[in-house]
Each structure stands twice: as C-alpha cells, then as structure tokens.
Amino acid sequence: SFNISRNNYDNVPLGNGENENSGIITAAVAFNPTVPVRDEKGNYSTNPQMPQLPNPVSLLEINDKTVKERLLGSAYIEVEPIKGLKLKANLGIDRKYQKRKTYLPKTTQYGAAVNGQAYLAQEDNNDYLMDLTANYQKIFGEHSFNVLFGYSYQKFNTEGMSAGNQDFINDSFLYNNLGAGNYSRPPVGSYASVSSLSSYFGRFNYSWKEKYLLT
C-alpha cells in the first residue's frame, strides 16, 4: 500500500516574541488602539508609547510559505517453495520533504531595519525498511516444531540546506532572487547524515501433544 500527501501552508507570525519580533497577537494586544493603521503618508503607523513594537496589521504582509510532502509505502511478498517452509520479504519506505520560503518586506518594522530579508530552507528525509524471514513448521505424530529465522535492515538518510539574504533594492523579488540582496555575509548552510541498523533474529519452538512447549 502507498499513501502520498502534499500540504501547503501560509504561515502567520503568531509567536510570542518581544519588541520588533512580536507576533500578531502580542502586537495587537499591546498596540495603542487609538493609533490609525496607516499614517498620512500611507505607511504603517507606529505606537508612540512603544515605537519598538510592530504594527500588527503590517505583519500580515510577511510572505511565509511551507510545502510538506510525504510518501509512505509498504509491500510484501510471501512464497512457499516447499511444504511447511514460508519465505517472506517485507519492504517499507517513509519519505518526507519540506520547503519553507520566507520574506519580510520593508513595510514591516524588522524588514525595514534590514531593507527586506529573504530566507529559504528545505529538508529531505528518507527512511527504508527491509525484513526477510524464513519460517518452517513440521508435525510428526505427537511432535511439532517451528523454526523462524530473520534479518532486518533499516536505513535513515537526512539532508537539508538553508540560505538567506537581506538589503534588497525593493520587495518585488520576495525570496526568488537571493543574489539580489546586498548583505555582506549572507547566511548559507547545509547538512547531511546517514545511519543504518541491522539485526538477525531467530526462534525455535517444540511442542509435544500440544501440551508441552519448549522454546
């Protein structure tokens, strides 16, 4: 069976940060309700009593989108080459991918301080599973026994990257042209990891008259 999903999110800064990092709820609660949304020049107004607090309406202009994709699948095959012997292979995959794109325009207080800020990040996770088993069962009169032997293997892959820039000429590029920013040291990072787990297992059961069991 396989299941594929894709979700798109328009993120809203609801966080409980302080000052220029305040989220919409914090800013709305603390902002002076008598101050108009925009001033006479059409810019977002600031709170005279708390100039470091962003205008809560301006935070709605932050462009912050996330895409999440997932593939979850499993399959198995079982054969019986001879009577009493069953061979089974079970395979599974869990792939998760997400990408986030953020742009803080100059109309926001924090974006104005840095002349616009863009950020991109993505991560890819791939997990694989393989189980192989051999199960043999035999009955001789009042005696019966069962032997199971198996091998299990799991592999985990993770890789990701992030990049950003600020100091843009205008807000039109959003996060689609990081090279247009003029920040002297734009942040760039990447990472990757691989790990695996393997094991062998076995079991032996002997029964006599279906009353006594040795394992």
PLM regions and their residue ranges:
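A conserved hydrophobic secondary-structure block that centers on an alpha-helix together
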Residues: 78-87, 92
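Outer-membrane beta-barrel channels and translocator barrels
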Residues: 80-82, 139-142, 209
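Outer-membrane beta-barrel architecture
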Residues: 74-76, 80, 133-135, 148, ...
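Generic low-polarity alpha-helical segments
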Residues: 2-4, 210, 215
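Surface-exposed loop/interface segments of Gram-negative outer-membrane beta-barrel transport/assembly proteins
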Residues: 1-70, 88-199
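Exposed, low-structure sequence patches enriched in small/polar residues
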Residues: 90, 201-207, 213-214
